[in-house]
């Protein structure tokens, strides 16, 4: 017996519990796809806002200090940018990163949820906000995050200001992800056939890169001498601090130790997390596809 088609209420409930949506929006009426998509957006995001409001009632997050977010962010990411990019490119990259951080608060969460371009990401941001309140999350499998990086924006929890791990810095961690999410042209840098993204980071090494940058940034911030850098790196490696399944904590500790012993540790981190083979540009993928089609026709 065929299953009954999902109703709008079914789709909203599924979205709230899993973050998943029907890309065709089949449950919604409308004159064509765009009409259905607009109706679905209104119902799904409206339901998300109402559920977040319900779960957050009576709760509050860590207060934000009266600080200039741009100045705070620049101070955190500038050493990383200076160490990873040639001098002629540093100002353009810094201009993007210093404006990249958005702290999720009770004041801005609803607007962000309604305006975000992707349903799944809006759901993740909702859970990030709820976690900062100590509230129940939306679903059993909802991620418990303190930060999320998308394109050139880093969403960060107010818990950033309550973090007591001396080697943690969510801003640096999320900013490090921008380097593989953002194309050079986006920040005004010249692209070439082999240089399309800000940095070439191995796909399986992206979290390793971010965790290594995070820890090394804190080592540099705290150390006053080369010997202190090495001692702090050893201290970092003495305790398992990462629970992320995609990352080997021992590998990160080794990278941080090697970086701390080098003149420019940022270059060490980049080299250790580089792709095993140079990634192809979108143009090269297109050329390969055309060549494959032509070869198939000649057979």
Where do the language-model regions lie?
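Non-catalytic protein-protein interaction scaffold segments in large eukaryotic complex-forming proteins
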Residues: 2-16
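Auxiliary, metal-adjacent structural segments of Zn-dependent hydrolase domains
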Residues: 18-153
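Long, well-structured alpha-helical subdomains associated
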Residues: 41-52, 57, 203, 214-299
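Short pre-active-site segment immediately N-terminal to the catalytic Zn-binding motif
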Residues: 156-171
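Active-site recognition of the HExxH zinc-binding catalytic motif
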Residues: 169-184
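Histidine-centered, metal-coordinating catalytic motifs and their short helical/loop contexts
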Residues: 174-177, 207-214
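Flexible internal linker/loop segments at domain or repeat junctions
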Residues: 181-198
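Active-site metal-coordination segments of metallo-dependent hydrolases
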Residues: 195-211
């Amino acid at each position: 017996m065929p299953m009954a088609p999902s109703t709008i209420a079914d789709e909203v409930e599924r979205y709230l519990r899993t973050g998943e949506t029907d890309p065709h929006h089949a449950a919604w009426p409308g004159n064509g796809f765009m009409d259905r998509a607009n109706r679905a957006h209104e119902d799904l995001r409206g339901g998300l806002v109402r559920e977040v409001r319900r779960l957050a009632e009576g709760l509050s997050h860590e207060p934000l200090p009266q600080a200039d977010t741009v100045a705070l962010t620049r101070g955190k990411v500038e050493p990383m940018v200076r160490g990873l990019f040639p001098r002629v490119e540093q100002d353009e990259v810094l201009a993007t990163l210093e404006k990249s951080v958005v702290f999720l608060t009770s004041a801005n969460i609803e607007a962000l949820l309604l305006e975000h371009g992707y349903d799944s990401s809006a759901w993740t941001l909702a859970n990030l906000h709820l976690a900062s309140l100590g509230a129940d999350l939306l679903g059993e499998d909802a991620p418990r995050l303190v930060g999320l990086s998308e394109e050139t924006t880093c969403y960060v929890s107010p818990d950033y200001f309550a973090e007591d791990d001396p080697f943690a810095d969510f801003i640096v961690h999320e900013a490090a992800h921008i380097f593989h999410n953002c194309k050079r042209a986006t920040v005004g840098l010249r692209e070439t056939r082999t240089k399309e993204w800000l940095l070439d980071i191995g796909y399986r090494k992206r979290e390793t890169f971010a965790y290594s940058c995070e820890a090394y940034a804190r080592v540099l911030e705290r150390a006053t001498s080369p010997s202190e850098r090495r001692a702090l790196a050893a201290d970092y490696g003495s305790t398992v601090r990462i629970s992320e399944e995609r990352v080997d904590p021992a590998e990160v500790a080794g990278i941080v130790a090697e970086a701390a012993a080098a003149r420019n540790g940022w270059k060490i981190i980049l080299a250790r997390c580089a792709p095993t083979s140079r990634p192809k540009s979108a143009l090269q993928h297109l050329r390969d596809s055309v060549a494959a089609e032509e070869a198939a026709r000649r057979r």
